[in-house]
């Protein structure tokens, strides 16, 4: 499933990998007075005077001596500090686990399991819901697994492609996977992580509105114009930008110039949805510019070169943010444009 989403990990470790650190950690917490027994369970008090709500102790061992999630998560922190000495450890889980991580982080700090300058952060995720507002399920009412979700999205895109007869049957499945990937990843990332959202397959696979396929279509449009220009024997000149001639061109340039700042801000706030909001804005600015501007039929060669350089820059930014793996041969991807009714490419 991760492979289908083109998601890869440098390291894959489970709770069992930290088990060996638990015995020494328990002894350390007891010997240094951080942990004490309360009704038979070994706990560490983590409440603070400034708390506005009750924060229960962090439970290290149950009364029967069994370890808990707190135990393994703390042992994992010790393992990571010993092996990697990270500047920051960031946990991604259901937002309903927030209290658990507050307890773990406070315990780790109190017991000096991490350095003072090591950041511990938690990103809580909301739930992906169906149109009824309840957690997304299969048609049969079971839990929707990622593999099945990917399959349903790909099938939806395949049907749209077949119905429009826009791609050769031999290419239809591959094209459906490309567009389906953009729909899933963009659809999820465009929502603020902590908020619940409705995953509407029909809306997310649409080529209209704030969707991955719409961004992909915009990339297709830029590639088509650039491809047409090169087919005529011309060579694209990088960095040939002139001062903007129209309001739409100026707006597009300003939007492109915000790229670095948006990415930096999204990184600092751990908010990828801000990048999605930006590329949607950029795609809209480009399409506005495109509809107002005769690009390839521009008689002033310097001005035309400027248009094309700007267009290429927009393409690179959109492609980088949507996903580099979506860079496909132009003659194949251009067929996607036909999936949008009334949207035949106007290359002049």
Residue ranges and their predicted role:
Residues 1-331, 348:
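Non-catalytic interaction-recognition regions
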Residues 336, 347:
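Cationic, low-complexity basic patches in intrinsically disordered or flexible, solvent-exposed regions
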Residues 340-343:
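Short, low-complexity intrinsically disordered segments enriched in A/P/G/S/L with frequent Arg
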């Amino acid at each position: 499933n991760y492979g289908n989403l083109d998601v890869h990990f440098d390291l894959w470790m489970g709770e069992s990998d930290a088990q060996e650190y638990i015995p020494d950690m328990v002894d350390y917490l007891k010997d240094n007075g951080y942990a004490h027994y309360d009704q038979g369970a070994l706990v560490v008090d983590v409440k603070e005077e400034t708390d506005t709500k009750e924060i229960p102790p962090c439970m290290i061992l149950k009364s029967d001596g069994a370890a808990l999630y707190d135990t393994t998560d703390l042992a994992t922190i010790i393992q990571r500090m010993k092996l990697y000495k990270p500047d920051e450890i960031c946990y991604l889980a259901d937002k309903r686990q927030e209290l658990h991580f507050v307890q773990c982080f406070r315990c780790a700090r109190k017991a000096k399991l991490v350095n003072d300058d090591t950041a511990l952060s938690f990103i809580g995720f909301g739930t992906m819901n169906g149109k009824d507002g309840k957690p997304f399920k299969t048609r049969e009412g079971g839990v929707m697994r990622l593999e099945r979700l990917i399959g349903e999205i790909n099938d939806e895109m395949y049907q749209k492609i077949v119905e429009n007869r826009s791609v050769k049957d031999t290419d239809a499945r591959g094209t459906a996977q490309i567009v389906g990937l953009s729909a899933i990843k963009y659809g999820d990332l465009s929502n603020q992580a902590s908020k619940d959202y409705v995953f509407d397959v029909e809306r997310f696979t649409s080529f209209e509105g704030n969707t991955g396929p719409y961004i992909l279509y915009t990339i297709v449009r830029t590639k088509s114009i650039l491809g047409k220009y090169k087919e005529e024997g011309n060579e694209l000149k990088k960095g040939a930008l002139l001062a903007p001639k129209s309001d739409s061109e100026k707006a597009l340039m300003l939007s492109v110039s915000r790229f670095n700042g948006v990415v930096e801000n999204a990184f600092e706030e751990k908010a990828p949805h801000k990048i999605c909001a930006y590329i949607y804005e950029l795609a809209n600015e480009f399409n506005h510019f495109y509809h107002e501007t005769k690009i390839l039929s521009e008689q002033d060669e310097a001005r035309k070169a400027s248009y094309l350089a700007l267009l290429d820059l927009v393409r690179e930014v959109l492609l980088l943010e949507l996903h580099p793996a979506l860079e496909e041969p132009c003659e194949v991807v251009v067929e996607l444009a036909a999936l949008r009714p009334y949207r035949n490419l106007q290359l002049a």
